[in-house]
Curated annotation (Swiss-Prot):
The gene is TIC214. It is found in: Plastid, Chloroplast inner membrane. This is Protein TIC 214. The keyword Transport applies. Residues 256-268 have a biased composition (Acidic residues). The chain crosses the membrane at residues 18-38, 64-84, 87-107, 124-144, 172-192, 221-241.
C-alpha cells in the first residue's frame, strides 16, 4: 500500500511538473492561436478551394506561415512589434494593397501572360497569392480577435525565465495546430468533392452551371468579403489627409508645433508651454530637462504627479550655467511675452534659462540664416511625421482635463527611461534615468571624438567605489561608537544626540527659517518664502552679478558652428551700468506688467515687488527707450528670475504638454470660455442639454444672467470624451439588444439581465393553492402561515408596484430620448403639440359643450352654459420647456423648435353631463376629492392627457358613464318595486288556491267521516278516542319546542354579530336587515309547515294493533282496506318528509356558517396565547442563562443601537475576523496601545511558585498582556514569518480593540455573521480594568495649567521617540518571550530598594476614546497642510456625518452617550455636569457651546469633560488656532485637520462643537462664514504675533484673554486675497472672473483641500425639482397669488423647502445630512519624518512632559548601569530626581534620520555575504549573531542571555517592519512618495563592525 501511494504521489507531481513546464504552456498557447480566425484564413481557404496547381497552394501556405512567424517574432522582438502596431503601418500596407487587389480581380487580362516556360516562382499570380497570405497575416485579426491570447502570452513571457524556449514551443504548437487545421480542411474539401449526395442534389442538378458560376465569381466574392473586413478595422484609423486638425492655443504655439521634434521614435520632447513658459533653475535628478517641459511657480499638491520640484539656495544657482534644452536637431524658441516691439522669428535656440544670458544670441541671429533654415526644415521632416502628425489627437488618446493648467499633460512620455549608469561601482541599468541627459550624452558623443572621452575600466570603478564607501562607513561607525562611548560615561549633556544645522534668516536676531521651509532640516522644499525684498538689495545684487550672467556659454559652439559671435559679443557688452542702476525700478515694473499678461494661471503665489505708486512713476518715453535697449540683450524671463534670486529658488521637473487647450461640447453650451465662443468644441461630451430655469431681466450693465441646469441624456454614452477626429477603439464582446439601453452588456452576463415578463413565472406561486387545501384542517398552523404569507404578499405587492413604476419611468425616458435622437423630430412634435392645443382649446371643447347642452335641451333638461364655460375658461395651457419647467401661457421657451416643448394643462376641462349643486357636498364626494390626484396634465402629440411628459395617456372620465349609472339605479329601483308587488300577489293567489282546495277536501272527507262515525259509534268505546288525541297533541308540542329552540339559536347568533362596535355602521345595518329578512322568511316557512302538519293529523286512523280491534282483522276484506289506506298515507306523506329534510339541512348549514368566524377567532386567540406563553418561557430561560454569566457592558450610542449593533443578548461576544482588516491599520492601532500598569501584580508573577496556583485561563490572559514569567513559556525562538504576524494579531485582539472598535472596523454584513472562533472570554473585569479598551471614555484627564505646546522640531524629543520605537518593537517581535522584556524584569522589591517612589493614580493609564497614546495635545501632529496620502479603506466604517440631535432626546439618552467609568474618582459629579452642558447647549443654540469661565471650579467639579474626544480640548478655553493653509470655516479648521489625518478618530459633531469661543463672543458673533470683499480684517497685535516664535503664537491662552476677538485667521489669508486679485488679472479672459473675494476663496479652498458633497435622497430631490418648476412659473406670472395658493394646496410646492434662510448655518445643513465634508485624497509631499510617524504611530508623549526648563534636563538622563532596565514612567508618577532609569532601545536614534539611513546603507553595502532567500537568517541561526553589547564593551555569550538578542532585534526592528508593511501595501514601487521607502528596499541591515 505504502509503495503504491508513493508511486501515485510521484506520478501526480510528475504530471504537475510537465503541465507547468514552459514547453507545454508554449504548445498550449500555440494551439490556441489556431482558433484566432482572421482575414488571412479567407485567402488560404480561397487558395485551397479555387486555385489550380500545387504551386499556388504551396505559396499560399508558405505566405500564411511566414506571416504568422513574423507575428510570433514580434511578440519577442519589440521593434517589429512596434512597427506592426503603429496605425500608419497598417494604413500604408492596407490601402494601396486593397486598391491593387481590386484592380487585379476586375482586370485579370492585364496581367494574363498566357502559359510561360519560365520558373513558376517568378509567376506574378503565384507571388500575389504569397503576398496575400503574408500581408493579411500582419493585419489585425478579425472574427475572433486574439487580444486575450496576446495578453496571456505577454503575462507568461513576463513570468517565465526561459523566454526563447517559450516562444519556440509556442511556434511549434502553432505549427502543429495549423498543419492539423489545414489537413482537416483538405479532407473536408475532398469529402465534398467525392460525396455523391451533394452532387445529386435536385437544385444543383437543375442548375447545371451553378457550380461553374460560383467558381468564376469566387474571386469577386472574396474581394467583397475582404473589402468589408478591411473597412471594418480601417474604420478605426483616421486617414492622414482628411483628419480634422485642431486649432492651437496661440500662434506662438503653432510655430513650436511646426518645429516639433523630427523623429517619432524619440518621444521625449514635446511642446513648450507656449506663452506661459517660465523656468527657474535646474533639477538635481534631471540636470538637462527635456525640451517639452513646463515649470510652475508655487506649490499645488495636485501637481505632484507632473512635477517634482526641489528648492535650493539661490546663491548656488550661478554654478549651473549650462542649462540648455536640447533636441536632436535643434532648439525651439518660445516667446515669453506678447510684446509687439520685438517679434521673434522661428529660430533654433530653445531658451528657457533663468540663471544666464544665453538668450542674447537668440535676438541677434541673422534673418537670412533663419529663412534658409526654414526652407531646409521641410525636407528634414520625415515622411511619417508629415503624414501622421503625432502631435494631434489622431490616436485614441483621452484628453484629461485639468482646471489648473492651461494645457493638458502629454501621456506618451514614460515615467521610466532605461539607460546605463554607475551604481554600486558597477555599470547597471537604471529605469529612472533622466531622458534628456541620455540624449544630451548621445549628442556629445557624436560631436566630440570618442577617443577624447576617458574610458575607465569597470574593475577600477568597482574597487574605487568600494574603497570610498568603506572609508565613509568606517567614519560613520567611528562617530557612532564615539557617541555611544560618551553615553557610557553617563554624560548629562544632550550633545550626544546629533544636532541638526538650521538655516538662518538673520544672524543678529538669531531668526531661523521655519522648519517647514528649512532645506537643511526638511529636505529641499517646494514652497516659496513669502518675504518682500527691498529694491536696493535687488539693485546691488543685480549689478554684482551682471557681468557673470551676460557671458556666453561657449558649449553652444559644439552644436552651432555657423554663428557669428563677434557682433553678438560687442552688442552684449555695450551695456551702460549707470543708467541701469537708476532705471532698474522702471525696468522691473515693466517686466512685471509684461509678465502679468503672459503669466500662467499656475502662478498663484507670484508677488508684485513694488507698490502701485512706484509702478505708476515710470513714464512712457523712458519705457520705450529702455525696452528697445533691453530687448537687444535681455530676456524678460531672465530678469524676472534675477529679481527672485534672493529667495529660495524653485526647481522643477518639467512635463511634456499638448499645445492644444480643448473645450468640450458642454463647455461650449455653457459658454464657459467666452473668448473662444467662436471656436468649435473638440471633445465630444455626453449628450446634454442646457435647461434655462430663470433669466434675470433687470437692467444691468452685464448681459442677462441666466440660471441654468445641465440635463444629461439617459441613453448610453458612447462618446466617452473622445476627441473629434481621433482614432476610435473598437469595443468587443459587447452587444446592444434594445433601442435604448443604459449600458452595453457582455454576453457573459445575459443571465443577470432581468428576464422578459412573458416567460417569467414563479413555481412557488403555482404550488401555493394546492398546499393551501392540504393545510386547511390544521387550524393553528394555518393561521400562523397566513400571517407570514400576508406580510410576504404585501411586500411582494409593494415590490411589484415599485418595479412597475420603474418600468413605466424607463419607458417614458425611452420615448423622450427617441424624440430627442430622431432628426427633425422635435420640430414635428412641437408643431403637432401647438396644433393639438389650439384644436383642444378652441374647437374640440367648445363643440362638446354645445353638443351637450343641445342634448340636455332635447331631453327637456335645463342647459348648463355658464357652468361649462366657466370651467372651460379655468383651463390654462402653459408652455413648458422640454424638461417640464413652466413658463407662461403666452411665452414660448427659447429655441423651442430645436430643444423641444411641453404643454402643461392646469385644471383640465372635463365634460360632465350635469353639475351638482355645491352647497352641501356629501361626505363621499369629499373623500373622492381627497383621493383625486393633482389637477394638471401634459398634452400628448395625439391630443391625449398624460400625468407626466411622455407618460402613458391617462383615462379620461367618461361623459356617458354617470348617465348609465343613473339609469341603472333607476331601473334597479323600478325592478325592486315591480318584483315586490309580483311576489305579494303571487303569494296571495297561492294561499287562496290552497285554502280553497283544502277546504273542499276537508268538506268531502268530513262528510264521509261523519257517516262512518255514525256507523261505528255504536261499536267502539269512547275512551280510545280520547287517548289518541293525547298522543297526537304530545307529538305536536315536541316538534314545536324543537323549532323554537333552533330559532332562538339563530337569533342569538345574530345578536352576537350585532353587538360589535362597527365603524362603517351604515353598511353593516343594511347587511343586518337582509339577514333578519331572511330569518323571518325562514320562520314563516316553518310555521306554515307546522300548520300543514296539524291539518294532516286528524286523518290518522286508530291504531290497528290494539287488542280491542282484533275482531276487525278477522275478515280479509277489512285487512285489504287497511293496507290500501296505509299505502295512500305513505304516498302523500313522502312529499312532506322530503320538504322537512331539506328544511333541516338548510337550517344546520346556516348555523354552521354563522359559527365559523366565532370558532376561528377562538382558535386564533388560543394559538396566540400559546405563542406568548412559549416566548415568555424562552425569555425567562435566556434571562437565567445571562444572569449566570458575567454581564458584558457595551457602550451603545442610543440612536445607532438598533441599526448598527444587531447583536443578540445570547451572542454578545466580540465578532472579529482578522482577515477583514487592513494590516496597516491594525498595525497602526496596535502600535499605539499604552504601557500597562504592572506594578500591582508584578511581584506575584516573578517567582516560580506562582505558576502552580494560577489557573490556565488567567495564565492565558496574562500571556496576552505579556506580563508572564519566563518559566511558564516556551523557550524556543519563534519563526518570524507570516505566523508571527497572525499570532501577534491573535494575541492582541481581545484588549486592543473593543466591541465598538470591531463593529466600526468591520462592515455590517460581516459583523452580523457570528464568528465563533474569536469569542471573547468573559474575564474578570476587576483584573484588567486599567488596560481594557472596553472602558473607552469620552472624558477628560486631569489638566495641567501649563499650556505650552509641544513641537516636532525640538531635538530633545528623540528620547520619547525611542520609547515609541521600543514599545512597538517589544510588542511585535517579542509577543511570546516577554519574560526578558523591560516590563517584567525587575521584581517589585528590587524597585523599592532603588528608592523609586511611585504613586499610581487610579486614573493613570486609562485609554482615551481616541487611539492616540497618552493624552497628548492635538498640535503634536498638526502642521500646515497635513493631509496624508491615503485612500479609503473599504473595510473601514467611516462616519456617516449625520449629527445627533440633542434637543430631541433631551436628557434621556445621555447615559448611553457617556460611558462613565466605574473606577473614577467618587467625588466627580459627572452626571450632573453632563446635563448642565446639555442644557447650556439648548439655550445657546448649535454653534456656541459654553466654555467654562473658571478653570479651577470646573476641575474641582469634574476632571472629565463631556465633549472631549482624544483630549482634543487641552483646555477647551485654551484651544489654539493654528496658522493653517486654509481658513474656510476658521472655527473648526484645527479639528478638521485632525480629521483628515485620522478620519476614524473624531465624530463629525465635535468638528463643529468644540469651538474656541467665549460667552460674550457667542452672543455678539455674526454667523457669516465668508467675509465680504469690502470688509478688511483687522486683527489686533498682528505685528506682535509675527515677531513671536510659533510656539508662543499658537498658545490658546492669548485667545482666551482677548474676550471679544474674532476668530484668528492666519496671515496667509491676506496673502491669499492679494494673490487671488492678482491671479485674476493675470488669467486674462480664459478663466471666469470672480466677482468677489469670497468666491475666489471658496473656489480655491474647494479645489485644493476639501471635497464638499451635497447629498439628498431621491424624495427630497424630487420635491426640490417640483419646487423649482413652480418657482419658475411664479416668477413669470403677473398675478401669481392664485397659482401659488393652489399649488400649495395641491402640495406641489412645499413651504419648508421654499423658506430659504438668508444665512443657513453650516450645522443645520450637516444636521440634515445634506452637507458632507470629506478631505480630498491628496498626495502631499510631506517630510519623511512625519509620514514615518504616521505609519508606525510613534508613541508621542503628552506635552506636560516636554517642558523646556531646567527640571526637564535634570530628570532625563541616561544611566549606563541600568541601561537594560528601561522602566516606563506612567503619566502621573512622582520621580525621585536622584536616580532615573531611562534607556534608548534603538541606539542608532542618536544619529538623526538622514545619517542613520546612511549608516545602515553603507554598512549594508560592505557586507557581501547576506542571504537573499531567508531574510531572517540572523534570528534562525543564533550562534552567528553577536549581541549588541559590544557597543557598550560588555561581552556575554549569546546563549546565556537572550535579552541581548532581543535588543539586537530592536536595533533594526522598526525599519525592517516598516519595509514589510510597505511591501504589503505596495507603497514602495511607482508612487510619488516612493522616496520615503527607498531605504526599505534594502533587505536587512547587518550589525556594525568594529575595526
Amino acid at each position: 500500500m505504502i509503495f503504491q501511494s508513493f508511486l501515485l504521489g510521484n506520478l501526480v507531481s510528475l504530471c504537475m511538473k510537465i503541465i507547468n513546464s514552459v514547453v507545454v504552456v508554449g504548445l498550449y498557447y500555440g494551439f490556441l492561436t489556431t482558433f484566432s480566425i482572421g482575414p488571412s484564413y479567407l485567402f488560404l481557404l480561397r487558395a485551397l478551394v479555387m486555385e489550380e496547381g500545387t504551386e499556388k497552394k504551396v505559396s499560399a501556405t508558405t505566405g500564411f506561415i511566414t506571416g504568422q512567424l513574423m507575428m510570433f517574432i514580434s511578440i519577442y522582438y519589440a521593434p517589429l512589434h512596434l512597427a506592426l502596431g503603429r496605425p500608419h503601418t497598417i494604413t500604408v500596407l492596407a490601402l494601396p494593397y486593397l486598391l491593387f487587389h481590386f484592380f487585379w480581380n476586375n482586370h485579370k487580362h492585364f496581367f494574363d501572360y498566357g502559359s510561360t516556360t519560365r520558373n513558376s516562382m517568378r509567376n506574378l499570380s503565384i507571388q500575389c497569392v504569397f503576398l496575400n497570405n503574408l500581408i493579411f497575416q500582419l493585419f489585425n485579426h478579425f472574427i475572433l480577435p486574439s487580444s486575450m491570447l496576446a495578453r496571456l502570452v505577454n503575462i507568461y513571457l513576463f513570468r517565465c525565465n526561459n523566454k526563447i524556449l517559450f516562444v519556440t514551443s509556442g511556434f511549434v504548437g502553432w505549427l502543429i495546430g495549423h498543419i492539423l487545421f489545414m489537413k482537416w480542411l483538405g479532407l473536408v474539401l475532398v469529402w465534398i468533392r467525392q460525396n455523391h449526395s451533394i452532387r445529386s442534389n435536385k437544385y444543383i442538378r437543375s442548375n447545371k452551371y451553378l457550380v461553374l458560376e460560383l467558381r468564376n465569381s469566387m474571386a469577386r466574392i472574396f474581394s467583397i468579403l475582404l473589402f468589408i473586413t478591411c473597412v471594418y478595422y480601417l474604420g478605426r484609423i483616421p486617414s492622414p489627409i482628411l483628419t480634422k486638425k485642431l486649432k492651437e492655443a496661440s500662434k506662438t504655439e503653432e510655430r513650436v508645433e511646426s518645429e516639433e521634434e523630427r523623429d517619432v521614435e524619440i518621444e521625449t520632447a514635446s511642446e513648450m508651454k507656449g506663452t506661459k513658459q517660465e523656468q527657474e533653475g535646474s533639477t538635481e535628478e534631471d540636470p538637462y530637462p527635456s525640451p517639452s517641459l513646463f515649470s510652475e511657480e508655487g506649490w499645488d499638491p495636485d501637481k505632484i504627479d507632473e512635477t517634482e520640484e526641489i528648492r535650493v539656495n539661490g546663491k548656488d544657482k550661478i554654478k549651473d550655467k549650462f542649462h540648455s534644452h536640447l533636441t536632436e536637431t535643434g532648439y525651439n524658441n518660445i516667446n515669453t511675452s506678447n510684446s509687439p516691439i520685438y517679434d521673434y522669428q522661428d529660430s533654433y535656440l530653445n531658451n528657457n534659462n533663468t540663471g544666464n544670458l544665453e538668450n542674447c544670441k537668440l535676438q541677434l541671429l541673422d534673418k537670412k540664416n533663419e529663412n534658409q533654415e526654414q526652407d531646409l526644415f521641410w525636407f528634414q521632416k520625415p515622411l511619417v511625421s508629415l503624414l501622421f502628425d503625432y502631435n494631434r489627437w489622431n490616436r485614441p488618446f483621452r484628453y484629461i482635463k485639468n482646471n489648473r493648467f492651461e494645457q493638458a499633460v502629454r501621456t506618451e512620455m514614460s515615467q521610466y527611461f532605461f539607460d546605463t549608469c554607475k551604481s554600486d561601482g558597477k555599470q547597471k541599468i537604471s529605469f529612472t534615468y533622466p531622458p534628456s541627459l541620455s540624449t544630451f550624452w548621445k549628442m556629445i558623443k557624436r560631436k566630440i571624438p570618442l577617443l577624447s572621452l576617458q574610458k575607465t575600466l569597470p574593475n577600477e570603478l568597482d574597487t574605487q567605489w568600494v574603497s570610498t564607501n568603506k572609508e565613509k562607513s568606517n567614519n560613520l561607525n567611528k562617530e557612532f561608537l564615539n557617541r555611544l562611548e560618551i553615553l557610557d560615561k553617563e554624560s548629562l549633556s544632550l550633545d550626544i544626540l546629533e544636532t541638526r544645522t538650521r538655516f538662518c534668516n538673520d544672524d543678529t536676531k538669531k531668526e531661523y527659517v521655519p522648519k517647514m521651509y528649512d532645506p537643511l532640516l526638511n529636505g529641499l522644499y517646494r514652497g516659496t518664502i513669502k518675504k518682500g525684498v527691498s529694491s536696493s538689495i535687488i539693485n546691488n545684487t543685480l549689478l554684482e552679478n551682471w557681468e557673470k550672467r551676460v557671458r556666453l556659454n561657449r558649449i553652444h559652439t559644439i552644436f552651432l558652428p555657423n554663428i557669428d559671435y563677434q557682433e553678438f559679443e560687442q552688442k552684449a557688452y555695450t551695456i551702460d551700468k549707470k543708467p541701469l542702476s537708476t532705471e532698474i525700478d522702471e525696468f522691473l515694473t515693466l517686466i512685471n506688467e509684461l509678465g502679468n499678461e503672459a503669466k500662467s494661471s499656475l502662478n498663484l503665489k507670484g508677488l508684485s515687488l513694488f507698490s502701485d505708486q512706484e509702478q505708476r512713476r515710470a513714464n512712457s518715453e523712458k519705457r520705450t527707450k529702455f525696452v528697445k535697449f533691453v530687448f537687444n540683450a535681455l530676456d524678460p524671463n531672465e530678469t524676472k528670475s534675477g529679481k527672485k534670486s534672493i529667495g529660495i529658488k524653485e526647481i522643477s521637473k518639467k512635463v511634456p504638454r499638448w499645445s492644444h487647450k480643448l473645450i468640450t461640447e458642454l463647455d461650449q453650451q455653457m459658454g464657459e470660455f467666452k473668448d473662444r465662443a467662436s471656436m468649435d468644441h473638440q471633445l465630444r461630451s455626453r449628450k446634454a442639454k442646457r435647461v434655462v430655469i430663470f433669466t434675470d431681466n433687470k437692467a444691468t450693465k452685464d448681459a442677462e444672467e441666466e440660471v441654468a441646469l445641465i440635463s444629461y441624456s439617459q441613453q448610453s454614452d458612447f462618446r466617452r470624451g473622445i476627441i473629434t477626429g481621433s482614432m476610435r477603439a473598437q469595443r468587443r464582446k459587447t452587444f446592444i439588444s434594445k433601442l435604448f439601453q443604459a449600458n452595453v452588456h457582455s454576453p457573459l452576463f445575459v443571465d443577470r439581465i432581468t428576464p422578459l415578463r412573458l416567460f417569467s413565472f414563479d413555481i412557488s406561486e403555482l404550488i401555493k393553492p394546492i398546499l393551501k387545501n392540504w393545510t386547511d384542517k390544521e387550524g393553528e398552523f394555518k393561521i400562523l402561515e397566513s400571517r407570514e404569507e400576508q406580510t410576504k404578499r404585501e411586500e411582494k405587492k409593494e415590490k411589484d408596484k415599485k418595479e412597475d413604476n420603474k418600468r413605466k419611468e424607463q419607458a417614458r425616458i425611452a420615448i423622450e430620448e427617441a424624440w430627442d435622437t430622431i432628426p427633425l423630430a422635435q420640430i414635428i412634435r412641437g408643431y403637432m403639440l401647438i396644433t393639438q392645443s389650439i384644436l383642444r382649446k378652441y374647437i374640440l371643447l367648445p363643440a362638446l359643450i354645445i353638443a351637450k347642452n343641445i342634448g340636455r335641451m332635447l331631453f327637456l333638461q335645463l342647459p348648463e352654459w355658464s357652468e361649462d364655460l366657466q370651467e372651460w375658461n379655468r383651463e390654462m395651457q402653459i408652455k413648458c420647456t422640454y424638461n417640464g419647467v413652466q413658463l407662461s401661457e403666452t411665452e414660448f421657451p427659447k429655441n423651442w423648435l430645436r430643444d423641444g416643448i411641453q404643454i402643461k394643462i392646469l385644471f383640465p376641462f372635463c365634460l360632465k353631463p350635469w353639475h351638482i349643486s355645491k352647497l352641501y357636498p356629501s361626505r363621499r364626494e369629499l373623500m373622492k376629492k381627497q383621493k383625486q390626484k393633482d389637477d394638471f396634465c401634459f398634452l400628448t402629440v395625439w391630443g391625449m392627457e398624460a400625468e407626466l411628459p411622455f407618460g402613458s395617456p391617462r383615462k379620461r372620465p367618461s361623459f356617458f358613464e354617470p348617465i348609465f349609472k343613473e339609469l341603472e339605479k333607476k331601473i334597479g329601483k323600478f325592478k325592486k318595486k315591480y318584483f315586490l308587488t309580483l311576489k305579494i300577489l303571487k303569494g296571495k293567489t297561492k294561499l287562496f288556491r290552497k285554502v280553497s282546495k283544502e277546504t273542499t277536501k276537508l268538506f268531502i272527507k268530513s262528510i264521509g267521516f261523519l257517516k262512518k262515525i255514525k256507523k261505528e259509534l255504536s261499536k267502539v268505546n269512547l275512551i280510545v278516542l280520547f287517548r289518541f288525541k293525547e298522543i297526537s297533541e304530545s307529538n305536536e308540542t315536541k316538534k314545536e319546542k324543537d323549532y323554537l329552540i333552533s330559532n332562538q339559536i339563530i337569533n342569538e347568533s345574530f345578536r352576537q354579530i350585532e353587538s360589535g362596535n362597527w365603524p362603517n355602521s351604515s353598511l353593516i345595518e343594511t347587511k343586518m336587515k337582509d339577514l333578519t329578512n331572511r330569518t323571518s322568511t325562514i320562520k314563516n316557512k316553518i310555521e306554515r309547515i307546522t300548520k300543514e302538519k296539524k291539518k294532516v293529523t286528524p286523518e290518522i286512523d286508530i291504531n290497528p294493533n290494539k287488542t280491542n280491534n282484533i275482531k276487525k282483522f278477522e275478515s280479509p276484506k277489512k285487512i285489504f282496506q287497511i293496507l290500501k289506506s296505509r299505502n295512500t298515507r305513505v304516498i302523500w306523506k313522502f312529499h312532506y318528509f322530503l320538504k322537512l329534510f331539506i328544511q333541516r339541512l338548510y337550517i344546520n348549514l346556516f348555523l354552521s356558517i354563522i359559527n365559523i368566524p366565532r370558532i376561528t377567532t377562538q382558535l386564533f386567540l388560543k394559538s396566540t396565547n400559546k405563542l406568548i406563553e412559549k416566548f415568555i418561557s424562552n425569555n425567562e430561560i435566556n434571562q437565567e442563562k445571562i444572569n449566570n454569566q458575567k454581564k458584558i457592558h457595551f457602550m451603545f450610542i442610543s440612536t445607532i443601537k438598533k441599526s448598527l449593533y444587531n447583536i443578540s443578548k445570547k451572542n454578545s461576544h466580540i465578532l472579529c475576523d482578522l482577515s477583514y482588516l487592513s494590516q496597516a491599520y491594525v498595525f497602526y492601532k496596535l502600535s499605539q496601545t499604552q504601557v500597562i500598569n504592572f506594578s500591582k501584580f508584578r511581584s506575584v508573577l516573578q517567582y516560580n511558585t506562582t505558576s502552580c496556583f494560577l489557573k490556565t485561563k488567567i495564565k492565558d490572559y496574562f500571556k496576552t498582556l505579556g506580563i508572564f514569567h519566563s518559566e511558564l513559556k516556551h523557550k524556543k525562538l519563534q519563526s518570524y514569518r507570516i505566523n508571527q504576524w497572525k499570532n501577534w494579531l491573535r494575541w492582541h485582539y481581545q484588549y486592543d480593540l473593543s466591541q465598538i472598535r470591531w463593529s466600526r472596523l468591520m462592515p455590517k454584513k460581516w459583523r452580523t455573521r457570528v464568528n465563533q472562533s474569536c469569542m471573547a472570554q468573559n474575564k474578570n473585569r476587576n483584573l484588567n480594568k486599567w488596560n481594557s479598551y472596553e472602558k473607552d471614555q469620552l472624558l477628560h484627564y486631569k489638566k495641567e495649567n501649563d499650556s505650552e505646546l509641544y513641537s516636532l522640531s525640538n531635538e530633545k524629543d528623540n528620547f520619547k521617540k525611542c520609547y515609541g520605537y521600543g514599545l512597538l518593537a517589544y510588542k511585535s517581535i517579542n509577543y511570546e518571550n516577554k519574560s526578558d522584556s523591560f516590563f517584567s524584569r525587575l521584581p517589585f522589591e528590587v524597585q523599592v530598594k532603588k528608592n523609586l517612589e511611585i504613586s499610581y493614580n487610579s486614573n493613570t493609564s486609562k485609554h482615551n476614546f481616541v487611539d492616540m497614546p497618552g493624552n497628548l495635545h492635538i498640535n503634536n501632529y498638526l502642521r500646515k497642510g497635513n493631509i496624508l496620502d491615503r485612500e479609503r479603506n473599504l473595510d473601514r466604517k467611516y462616519f456617516d456625518w449625520k449629527i445627533i440631535h440633542f434637543s430631541l432626546r433631551q436628557k434621556g439618552d445621555i447615559e448611553a452617550w457617556v460611558k462613565i467609568d466605574t473606577n473614577s474618582n467618587p467625588n466627580t459629579k459627572i452626571g450632573i455636569n453632563n446635563y448642565q452642558i446639555i442644557d447650556k447647549i439648548e439655550k445657546k443654540g448649535v454653534f456656541y457651546l459654553t466654555t467654562h469661565q473658571n478653570p479651577e471650579k470646573t476641575q474641582k467639579n469634574s476632571k472629565k469633560f463631556f465633549f472631549d474626544w482624544m483630549g482634543m480640548n487641552e483646555k477647551i478655553f485654551n484651544r489654539p488656532i493654528l496658522n493653517l493653509e486654509f481658513w474656510f470655516f476658521p472655527e473648526f479648521v484645527l479639528l478638521y485637520n485632525v480629521y483628515k489625518i485620522k478620519p476614524w478618530i473624531i465624530p463629525s459633531k465635535f468638528l463643529l462643537f468644540n469651538l474656541n469661543t467665549n460667552k460674550n463672543v457667542s452672543q455678539n458673533k455674526n454667523q457669516n462664514f465668508f467675509l465680504p470683499s469690502n470688509k478688511k480684517i483687522k486683527i489686533k497685535n498682528r505685528s506682535q504675533e509675527a515677531k513671536e516664535p510659533p510656539s508662543q503664537r499658537e498658545r490658546g491662552s492669548d485667545i482666551e484673554n482677548k474676550g471679544n476677538l474674532s476668530p484668528v485667521f492666519s496671515k496667509h489669508q491676506t496673502d491669499l486675497e492679494k494673490d487671488y486679485v492678482e491671479s485674476d488679472t493675470k488669467k486674462g479672459k480664459n478663466k471666469k472672473q470672480y466677482k468677489s473675494n469670497t468666491e475666489a476663496e471658496l473656489d480655491l479652498f474647494l479645489k485644493r483641500y476639501l471635497l464638499f458633497q451635497l447629498r439628498w435622497n431621491g424624495a427630497l430631490n424630487q420635491r426640490m425639482f417640483e419646487n423649482i418648476k413652480v418657482y419658475c412659473l411664479l416668477l413669470r406670472l403677473i398675478n401669481p397669488t392664485k397659482i401659488t395658493i393652489s399649488s400649495i394646496q395641491r402640495r406641489e410646492m412645499s413651504l419648508d423647502i421654499m423658506l430659504i434662510q438668508a444665512n443657513l448655518p453650516l450645522t443645520d445643513l450637516m444636521k440634515k445630512g445634506v452637507l458632507i465634508i470629506e478631505p480630498i485624497r491628496l498626495s502631499v509631499k510631506d517630510n519623511g519624518q512625519f509620514i514615518m510617524y504616521q505609519t508606525i504611530g510613534i508613541s508621542l508623549i503628552h506635552k506636560s512632559k516636554h517642558q523646556t526648563n531646567q527640571r526637564y534636563r535634570e530628570q532625563r538622563y541616561v544611566d549606563k548601569k541600568n541601561f537594560d532596565e528601561f522602566i516606563l514612567q506612567p503619566q502621573t508618577q512622582r520621580i525621585n530626581t536622584e536616580k532615573t532609569h531611562f534607556g534608548l532601545l534603538v541606539p542608532e536614534n542618536i544619529l538623526w534620520s538622514r545619517r542613520r539611513r546612511e549608516l545602515r546603507i553603507r554598512s549594508f553595502f560592505n557586507s557581501w555575504n547576506w542571504n537573499v532567500v531567508d531574510r531572517n537568517s540572523v534570528f534562525c541561526n543564533e550562534t552567528n549573531v553577536k549581541n549588541w553589547s559590544q557597543f557598550l564593551g560588555e561581552r556575554k555569550p549569546l546563549y546565556k542571555d537572550k535579552n541581548e538578542l532581543i535588543k539586537f532585534k530592536f536595533f533594526f526592528w522598526p525599519n525592517y517592519r516598516l519595509e514589510d508593511l510597505a511591501c504589503m501595501n505596495r507603497y514602495w514601487f511607482d508612487t510619488n512618495n516612493g522616496s520615503r521607502f527607498s531605504i526599505l528596499r534594502i533587505h536587512m541591515y547587518p550589525r556594525l563592525k568594529i575595526n
